[in-house]
């Protein structure tokens, strides 16, 4: 009996908590395959997952990764040195969230040596004039590592380092949102037609959104630049706002 309007906010919160839209979408595919969710309900959840996944990029923008190790330590302490079940569960959450942000920090740091490679810098500088190539790069990289949060974290690092301008970064961001749909597609391969429709709808949402944003790339870039100047956003937060705007509009 879950309505579309109920499904959307529930899934936004759920995705924000587990930090994985792909994980939520795979669960949805399984529930639809088992007949526990209708296609309409599933679409509402997928839409919510797309919005909920933007929370990670905002957390990176707030530099929460700087506190990853203390959070991991606190989570481990609650998990291994307390006998209270609620504290154990809280410890699992803190340990997992801290681990995610520690890993994202490591990936961001791994990009640092590339900033001194002239060929790499020159190639990235051309992407502002080749948005379709940016989409392909974003989609391909996200399909490869199965995490849009990770690729967007890398993108935030590249943009903050001045290796990409905003018009070059945005198509990669759009591609990341297409690439993240591969997990649902793979999960639906052995499922029934209803589950395949959910995966197809997920792909369709993000592809249509990307095509529209590419057509409107100049005004979309101007909008994000306006957010940046009016709100005084850091480069990382600028990408986070772009990610949020894309998924909410989508």
Predicted regions and their residues:
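Interfacial helix-loop-helix linkers and transmembrane-helix boundary segments
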Residues: 39, 84-91, 191-201
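Hydrophobic, small-residue-rich alpha-helical packing segments that form membrane-like cores
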Residues: 63-75, 79-148, 153-157
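Juxtamembrane membrane-interface segments at transmembrane alpha-helix termini
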Residues: 41, 81-88, 102-109, 167-168, ...
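Alpha-helical transmembrane segments of multi-pass membrane proteins, especially transporters
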Residues: 11-15, 26, 40-49, 93-101, ...
